[in-house]
A protein has these predicted regions:
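Ferredoxin-type iron-sulfur electron-transfer modules and their immediate structural context
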Residues: 127, 150, 155-198
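Histidine-anchored nucleotide/phosphate-binding helix
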Residues: 19-35
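Gly-rich Lys/Arg/Thr-decorated short loops/hinges at beta-loop-alpha junctions or inter-strand turns
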Residues: 1-14, 135
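Hydrophobic alpha-helical positions that pack around
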Residues: 39-150, 156-163, 171
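Short, small-residue-enriched loops and turns at beta-alpha junctions
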Residues: 18, 76-77, 174-176
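Conserved "landmark" site that anchors the functional core of diverse proteins
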Residues: 15-16, 38
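Short connector loops at secondary-structure junctions
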Residues: 7-8, 31-35, 42-46
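Short beta-strand elements
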Residues: 1-2, 116, 190-194
Length: 198
């Protein structure tokens, strides 16, 4: 199952990847499917991303082992257990792992990285990060090298509109408050959000 849900508000990094790198996404999924003889690949996307659904359906129409599943847009649709249930109808409880339901869940950025590593020989050196929130001058998505200082990334987005009340790494629901942005972008950095109010 490819987690294309990206259900947290403000984060659009995977959305941009699906629009701009769909071939690499599908190629990465095909690499993973080679590891499992009888597996089916599911691109699980919330139904508010109709442009991605349409594009990915076009690209997999001749791929018998891959299908696109449109999911209801709701939080926390992208959480692993909810995603598995919504995509396959298989329920797993908190003591179970996805493998207990016969599933592997990967995200968009991971599969693109798999494609690049296996097909092109390029190691994981960059990722897309969303910089957004009402305290950000020019919100957007940025393809940046791992290790880049997050202050530089914020400057690339035009900086903050004054001193933000709160800065969050990740989404507003599952992310965490940052006390400093003088830290590097890592492979798990999906977003930097700046807000003027709590």
């Amino acid at each position: 199952i490819v987690n294309c849900a990206e259900c947290e508000p403000y984060i659009t990094a995977d959305y941009r990847r699906m629009l701009e790198n769909p071939d690499e996404l599908i190629s990465g999924l095909k690499v993973v499917l080679q590891l499992f003889d009888n597996a089916t690949g599911i691109l699980a996307i919330e139904d508010n991303k109709s442009d991605c659904i349409q594009r990915l359906e076009e690209l997999v129409q001749n791929e018998p082992r891959i299908k696109v599943v449109a999911l209801q847009t709701k939080y926390p649709q992208g959480a692993e257990r909810q995603l598995i249930y919504a995509s396959t109808g298989r329920a797993i409880n908190s003591s179970m792992l996805p493998a207990d339901a016969g599933c592997v869940v990967d995200n968009v950025e991971t599969l693109i990285s798999i494609h690049r590593a296996v097909i092109t020989g390029k190691p994981l050196m960059e990722r897309v990060v969303t910089v957004s929130g009402d305290a950000v001058n020019e919100p957007g998505n940025f393809l940046v090298p791992l290790g880049m200082n997050q202050n530089e990334l914020i400057e690339a987005a035009g900086g903050f509109k004054g001193e933000p009340e709160k800065i969050i790494s990740g989404g507003p629901m599952m992310g965490f408050a940052m006390f400093t942005t003088d830290t590097p972008v890592t492979k798990t950095s999906s977003a930097i959000l700046g807000f003027t109010e709590d």
